Swiss-Prot record:
Family membership noted in the UniProt record: Belongs to the ribonuclease M5 family.
Molecular function in Gene Ontology: metal ion binding; ribonuclease M5 activity; rRNA binding
EC number: 3.1.26.8
Source species: Listeria monocytogenes serovar 1/2a (strain ATCC BAA-679 / EGD-e)
Catalytic activity field: Endonucleolytic cleavage of RNA, removing 21 and 42 nucleotides, respectively, from the 5'- and 3'-termini of a 5S-rRNA precursor
Cofactor(s), names only, from the UniProt record: Mg(2+)
Subcellular location: Cytoplasm
Single GO BP term: rRNA processing
UniProt xrefs under NCBIfam families: 5S_RNA_mat_M5
HAMAP family for the chain: RNase_M5 (MF_01469)
Main location (coarse class): cytoplasm
GN (gene name): rnmV
Job of this protein: Required for correct processing of both the 5' and 3' ends of 5S rRNA precursor. Cleaves both sides of a double-stranded region yielding mature 5S rRNA in one step.
This protein's name: Ribonuclease M5
Length: 191
């Protein structure tokens, strides 16, 4: 017995090195996109996997990874999303950013804290005014706060334009957002 958790869903990753990292961390089947140019064949494979057992999209926390995530989510509704923090996806040496650099513990944590996109039963709406008031849009430190919010809420990093949509997509309530911001403010005061 390996002691590794078993993931029922198929995990969609970008490449072979990501599959290796997943296999060292959990027992799961993966589907590799092999780059950001998603073929129709890959989309069909993901669609079939979603129908069979469900899919968790687990791409790198960078622009190409986010592009792949959006393409899949658009073509195959109802997918689950796992996010790895940017700092956990940095290599020990050299350049790059990716799932393949994350520790087994970080990979397991990301897969345990997935979100499901789609139409939530009760649509959450958080106005831009609230996002500005919480220091997440415009102003000094907004980018850093958005990155921290993404880590706390396990929704990944988003830029200012994407934040409201991401919060709605994963049905994050205003109360959850405010609580996460209070945690960040507490950390900033303690620094």
């Amino acid at each position: 017995m390996s002691g590794k958790p078993v993931i029922h869903e198929f995990i969609v990753v970008e490449g072979r090195d990501d599959t290796t990292a997943i296999n060292r961390s959990v027992i799961a089947d993966t589907i590799e996109t092999n780059g950001s140019a998603l073929s129709q064949e890959t989309i069909e494979k993901i669609r079939h996997a979603q129908e069979l057992r469900g899919v968790i999209i687990f791409t790198d926390p960078d622009f190409p990874g986010e592009k792949i995530r959006k393409q899949i989510d658009s073509a195959v509704p109802g997918c689950k999303h796992a996010f790895i923090n940017r700092q956990d996806a940095l290599p020990k040496a050299g350049r790059g950013l990716g799932v393949e650099h994350a520790s087994s513990a970080n990979i397991r944590e990301a897969l345990e804290n997935f979100h499901t996109s789609g139409a939530p039963t009760e649509k959450q709406f958080i106005s831009k005014d609230i996002l500005v008031h919480l220091g997440l849009l415009g102003g000094v430190g907004a980018k850093e706060r958005r990155e921290k919010i993404g880590n706390i809420l396990k929704i990944g990093y988003t830029n200012g334009k994407q934040l409201q949509t991401r919060l709605e997509s994963f049905a994050i309530s205003e109360e959850q957002l405010v609580a996460a911001c209070q945690k960040i403010m507490q950390e900033e005061e303690n620094e």
